Each structure stands twice: as structure tokens, then as C-alpha cells.
């Protein structure tokens, strides 16, 4: 038997909004330590990874490891039926071919449940090697989302250049060019407004804007985003989910003569 409960449906809605554009279907791997999801996007360019710790749930029970393949579009439709302040419970029997979502109103006067068929998905689990990154940038997630959105107007690709002076985002195309430079914040009252750069050596890499913009769908989950970069290694874009876990996106840099 698997059962996981969150007091507030909003967080699960936000998590799904963060991954459903990139991943159409995925397997939720449930164990006593929590829920893991890892899947390549449909064009096999980027990887999405979700970790939700069992101790972050209001209630969590997993008698044996269970893999639940789900269509994320269908799951999003079901979650749309929940009010933001509903308690949401996800349940599945061992070896079941369906999963149940139960929504309960705060006053316990309304309870609704939705059953969804599970899918058998053939997904390999990719080992992600531990990497010592040359540059790690922490910055406000809304600022990163805005930069990705703005620079995508100029080009399909965005250059991220990290030095000890700061981090620079650039794009150039037929219309013209755009540059946004952020210096490390010297003093900041609110931690979530800080720009913090940890640099071992300078890095300049180019990435496809459309994937970066897809990653920023996770912005509502976290006030800060962390970008980890190293030459010839996929970029890691990480959003922490407070007291519950994190979402990480991996995107390989574009090669100079790569037109894709």
C-alpha cells in the first residue's frame, strides 16, 4: 500500500506545472524514503529530476517500493479539480494498475476522489555523475525567468558567461543583441534577493532558450534558483521545494556548429 498526503494541494499543482511541459509522461518511483522521478524530455535533449522526501509529507506510507507510470497531462487535469486549500492524498495498492487522488476541503464537508489508470513506461534510470562545478550561481528565480524570457526574443540560443566579476547572459540574432549582467550582491536584507557566485574557474557556455524557458516553469516553487556549470558538462538548474525536496533540470550545452 502506498499513501502520501499533503495539507495543501497548491504545492502539487506547482510541481506538476513545473514538469508537464517538458515531460509528457513519467514514472514516479516511491519508496519509504520518498518519491523520485527522472525522465528525459520528448526530444531527449534535457533531463528532469524530482525528489520529494517522505518527511516533507503530512502523512507518508510506502510498504514496498512501487513504480507508477503516469500521463502528466491527465494528472494535471485531475489536480485542476482540487481547490488550492484542499488536502490531497495520493493512494495506490501494491501491484495496482490505477492510482487514486483524494481531495478534502478544509472543513471536511467535501471529499472527492479521482482514479487514474497507470501506464507501463519503459524508462531507463540514468546515472548522473557527481561533478565539481566550475561555477555555481544562486540568484532570484523570477530574475532568471525574466532574463530567459527577454533574451529568447533575440535568439534561439543564450550564452551564459560566469567570471569573478559576475554572471552575464547574452543573446544575438537578426534583430540585434542583448546582454544582461548581474554582479554578486555585496549586502542584501533578504536572502532570496541575493546573487551569489562561487567560481573555481571562468565558464562560458551556450544553451537553447526554449529549454531554459521550460525550466523556469518551476519559478513559483522557489524564490531562488541555482545554476551549476562546468565546461562540456550539462548545466544543472535547481529549484528547492521548501521542506519537501527539489526539482533539477539538466541541459547539455550547444556545440558551436550545432544547429539544433
From Swiss-Prot:
Gene3D superfamilies: 3.70.10.10
Alphabetized GO MF terms: DNA binding; DNA polymerase processivity factor activity
Keywords assigned: DNA replication, DNA-binding, Nucleus
GO cellular component: PCNA complex
Alphabetical list of InterPro entries matching this protein: DNA_clamp_sf (IPR046938), Pr_cel_nuc_antig (IPR000730), Pr_cel_nuc_antig_C (IPR022649), Pr_cel_nuc_antig_CS (IPR022659), Pr_cel_nuc_antig_N (IPR022648), TonB_box_CS (IPR010916)
Superkingdom of this protein's organism: Eukaryota
DNA-binding residues: 61-80
Localization in the cell: Nucleus
Keyword RNA-binding: no
Entry keyword Ribosomal protein: no
A GO biological process held by the record: regulation of DNA replication
Self-association and partners: Homotrimer. Forms a complex with activator 1 heteropentamer in the presence of ATP.
HAMAP family: DNApol_clamp_arch
PANTHER family: PROLIFERATING CELL NUCLEAR ANTIGEN
Function summary: This protein is an auxiliary protein of DNA polymerase delta and is involved in the control of eukaryotic DNA replication by increasing the polymerase's processibility during elongation of the leading strand.
Full protein name: Proliferating cell nuclear antigen
Gene label: PCNA
Amino acid at each position: 500500500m502506498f499513501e502520501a498526503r499533503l495539507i495543501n494541494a497548491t504545492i502539487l499543482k506547482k510541481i506538476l506545472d513545473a514538469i508537464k511541459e517538458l515531460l509528457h509522461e513519467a514514472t514516479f518511483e516511491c519508496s519509504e524514503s520518498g518519491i523520485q522521478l527522472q525522465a528525459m524530455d520528448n526530444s531527449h535533449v534535457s533531463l528532469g529530476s524530482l525528489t520529494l522526501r517522505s518527511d516533507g509529507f503530512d502523512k507518508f506510507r510506502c510498504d514496498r517500493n512501487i513504480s507508477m507510470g503516469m500521463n502528466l497531462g491527465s494528472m494535471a487535469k485531475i489536480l485542476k479539480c482540487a481547490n488550492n486549500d484542499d488536502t490531497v492524498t495520493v493512494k495506490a495498492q501494491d501491484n495496482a494498475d490505477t492510482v487514486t487522488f483524494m481531495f478534502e476541503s478544509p472543513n471536511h464537508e467535501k471529499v472527492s476522489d479521482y482514479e487514474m489508470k497507470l501506464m507501463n513506461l519503459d524508462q531507463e534510470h540514468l546515472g548522473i555523475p557527481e561533478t565539481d562545478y566550475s561555477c555555481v550561481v544562486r540568484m532570484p528565480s523570477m530574475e532568471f525567468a525574466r532574463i530567459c524570457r527577454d533574451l529568447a526574443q533575440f535568439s534561439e540560443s543564450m550564452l551564459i558567461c560566469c567570471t569573478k566579476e559576475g554572471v552575464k547572459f547574452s543573446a544575438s540574432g537578426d534583430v540585434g543583441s542583448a546582454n544582461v549582467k548581474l554582479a554578486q550582491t555585496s549586502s542584501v536584507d533578504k536572502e532570496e534577493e541575493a546573487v551569489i557566485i562561487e567560481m573555481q574557474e571562468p565558464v562560458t557556455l551556450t544553451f537553447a532558450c526554449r529549454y531554459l524557458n521550460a525550466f523556469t516553469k518551476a519559478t513559483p516553487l522557489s524564490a531562488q534558483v541555482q545554476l551549476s556549470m562546468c565546461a562540456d558538462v550539462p548545466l544543472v538548474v535547481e529549484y528547492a521545494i521548501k521542506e519537501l525536496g527539489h526539482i533539477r533540470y539538466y541541459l547539455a550545452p550547444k556545440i558551436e556548429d550545432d544547429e539544433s
